Amino acid sequence: MSTTSSHDHDGATHSDGAKVIETTLEHPIQIHLWEDRTRGELWVPTYDPTGLALLADDYLRIAGNNAVDNGQRTFEFKAVKPGTHRVLFEKRMGWKFTAEDRRVFDVTASDPSSRRSA
């Protein structure tokens, strides 16, 4: 399972395992996660909507000659206020009460207008 951001993301990681993504209020970020829907996997994001807005949630199935339904899920977020905003993704399966896996991202958003005036 790979996770990437299509925005400027150097792969920095906090001591608690959270991946750090730096952005500005003007630039949305994308987080890509692999899902195997044949197994019933589904990534569920938890975040504070006062700090981040979810702009898109897309799924791209990987074509193959078999009945397996796996692919890449893309979540696109935009920061609505400056600061560090945590996004927790839990891989859920319909018949389980606990998460199969977790991914944590800290999105640090700066206000580009405050840089210009400084």
Language-model features, listed with the residues they occupy:
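Beta-sandwich strand segments
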Residues: W95-R102
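Beta-strand-rich extracellular modules
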Residues: E90-G94
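Short, solvent-exposed loop/linker segments at beta-strand-coil boundaries, enriched for Pro/Gly
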Residues: R39, Y47-A63
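Short, conserved beta-strand segments of beta-strand-rich sandwich/propeller modules, principally
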Residues: Q30, T84-L88
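N-terminal edge beta-strand
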Residues: S2-I31, D36
